[in-house]
Amino acid sequence: MAHKKGASSSRNGRDSNAQRLGVKRFGGQVVKAGEIIVRQRGTHFHPGDGVGRGKDDTLFALQPGSVQFGTRRGRKVIDVVSVDA
């Protein structure tokens, strides 16, 4: 196999697809059970009351309610607080 590049060839031209990470529901927004709140790599945000964590560290609502961001013990935490109408 030749290891020299041929005429007008390139070793570039590849790129990976975006992972579409980030906050999907912001503070004060109303969510239903099962709705994704944050897609993340690692635990930038930790699950609080009414929030579950998937195996890829995705945070999702366990109950319907309003999303609240806060801190607990120096960690960023997300809670889902039930909305009593």
From Swiss-Prot:
GO terms for cellular component: cytosolic large ribosomal subunit. Belongs to the bacterial ribosomal protein bL27 family. Keywords: Ribonucleoprotein, Ribosomal protein. PROSITE patterns: RIBOSOMAL_L27. It comes from Beutenbergia cavernae (strain ATCC BAA-8 / DSM 12333 / CCUG 43141 / JCM 11478 / NBRC 16432 / NCIMB 13614 / HKI 0122). InterPro entries: Ribosomal_bL27, Ribosomal_bL27_CS. NCBIfam families: L27 (TIGR00062). Residues 1-21 are annotated as: Disordered. PANTHER family: LARGE RIBOSOMAL SUBUNIT PROTEIN BL27M, RIBOSOMAL PROTEIN L27. GO terms for molecular function: structural constituent of ribosome. GO terms for biological process: translation. It comes from the Bacteria. This is Large ribosomal subunit protein bL27. Residues 7-19 have a biased composition (Polar residues).
